[in-house]
Every structure is written in structure tokens, then in C-alpha cells.
């Protein structure tokens, strides 16, 4: 018996090999990786203390149609929701910090202007990305619809993310914080 309920969220580096990082690449080893987890690592939920914690796989900067449908069906429960995902969602202030002010926030400097490694960065802000990163991180229509749904859903209380190895709290909307954690962070979050 587990002392605490567990819910795992997919991480970018769970899958093996080197290839174009997308759903097809992920699916090459998904079944093997999935065997190690109790929940579906692409999308799953668990209600803990009256809060619906939802894990979504956006490890390759995209959401899929079935994930949006899953979110919408989870909202039908009417419970407060906390989303967990690997890559943070685009938020202007955080994008500017991680792209243009890396050294001031404690990240290593880059010899060229880096990409932000966020899901949903507007295409017009990707002009300085190298070709590989621009193609990898350009949001598709489903991803943009999913992000818009997340921003507009009144049940979402917070988004928890990581990936960028930097701690930051951003306002995804006026009422929804996006809490980005580094590998050494421990946070206590109160959900109302």
C-alpha cells in the first residue's frame, strides 16, 4: 500500500534513441515505458483531497486532440483542477526572461539567442530560433486550441511544469499561476 497517491507525468527524456522528437518517435517506445507506470503517462487524472490533478504529456511541445477531449471530460467533474506537464506554457514575461535575460536569472549564457523551450510560443517570436528548434516547437492548431481552453477554463487553479531547470511563478491568466520548478524545488501549494 502506498502512503501517498501517485500520478506521474511524462518527461521529455523518458523515451530512448535519437530521432525527430514527435508523437511517432514517442510511440516507438511508449508501450515499453508505460509498463513502469500505473497511470497512462500521456494523460491521466487523480482526485486528491477534492482537487483533480491532471497529468498531460506535452514533452514535445504539442498537445493532441484526444488530450483536449480528455481535459474537457475531466472538467465535467466540476472539481478544481491542477494541471501537471513537463514543458511550461508560453507566458510573455517568462519567455522574455528565459530568452533574453538568461544570465540575470542564473541560467548559463548562450553564444547565440536561444529558444525558450516553452509550449505555444507565437510563431512571430520564433524568428531567432534555429531551424530545428523552430520546426520542433511551432505549435499546431490542436495545441493552440488546447492552450486557449486551459486559459479559459474557470476550474483550473494552477499549472505545474518544469523542463527549463529554473524556478519561476508566472501568471498564466489573472487567476491561474503557472509554477515552474527546477529539479531541486519542493513546493507546498494550497488549492482553493
Name the predicted role of every residue range:
Residues 1-82, 96, 100-117, 152-155, ...:
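Extended active-site neighborhood of metal-dependent phosphoesterases/phosphodiesterases
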Residues 104-142:
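Low-complexity, serine/threonine/proline-enriched polar segments
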Residues 55, 138, 162:
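Small/polar loops that bind or transfer phosphate-bearing groups
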Residues 140-144, 170-171:
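Active-site-flanking ligand-binding surface segments in enzyme catalytic domains
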Residues 148-163:
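Functionally important transmembrane alpha-helices
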Residues 68, 143-147:
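Extracytoplasmic/secreted envelope proteins and their assembly/folding machinery
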Residues 82-89, 159-167:
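Histidine-centered catalytic micro-motifs
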Residues 14, 89-91:
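Feature marks short, surface-exposed loop/turn motifs that line or immediately flank catalytic pockets
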Amino acid at each position: 500500500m502506498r502512503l501517498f497517491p501517485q500520478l506521474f507525468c511524462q518527461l521529455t527524456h523518458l523515451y530512448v534513441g535519437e530521432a525527430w522528437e514527435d508523437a511517432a518517435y514517442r510511440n516507438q517506445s511508449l508501450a515499453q515505458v508505460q509498463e513502469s507506470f500505473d497511470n497512462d503517462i500521456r494523460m491521466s487524472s487523480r482526485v486528491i483531497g477534492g482537487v483533480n490533478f491532471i497529468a498531460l504529456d506535452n514533452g514535445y511541445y504539442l498537445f493532441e486532440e484526444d488530450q483536449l477531449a480528455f481535459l474537457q471530460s475531466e472538467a465535467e467533474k466540476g472539481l478544481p483542477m491542477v494541471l501537471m506537464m513537463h514543458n511550461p506554457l508560453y507566458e510573455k514575461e517568462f519567455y522574455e526572461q528565459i530568452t533574453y535575460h538568461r544570465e540575470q536569472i542564473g541560467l548559463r549564457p548562450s553564444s547565440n539567442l536561444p529558444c525558450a523551450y516553452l509550449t505555444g510560443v507565437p510563431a512571430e517570436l520564433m524568428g531567432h530560433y534555429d531551424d530545428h528548434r523552430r520546426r520542433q516547437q511551432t505549435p499546431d492548431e490542436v495545441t493552440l486550441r488546447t492552450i486557449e481552453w486551459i486559459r479559459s477554463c474557470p476550474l483550473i487553479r494552477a499549472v505545474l511544469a518544469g523542463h527549463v531547470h529554473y524556478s519561476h511563478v508566472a501568471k498564466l491568466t489573472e487567476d491561474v499561476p503557472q509554477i515552474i520548478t527546477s529539479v531541486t524545488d519542493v513546493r507546498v501549494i494550497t488549492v482553493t
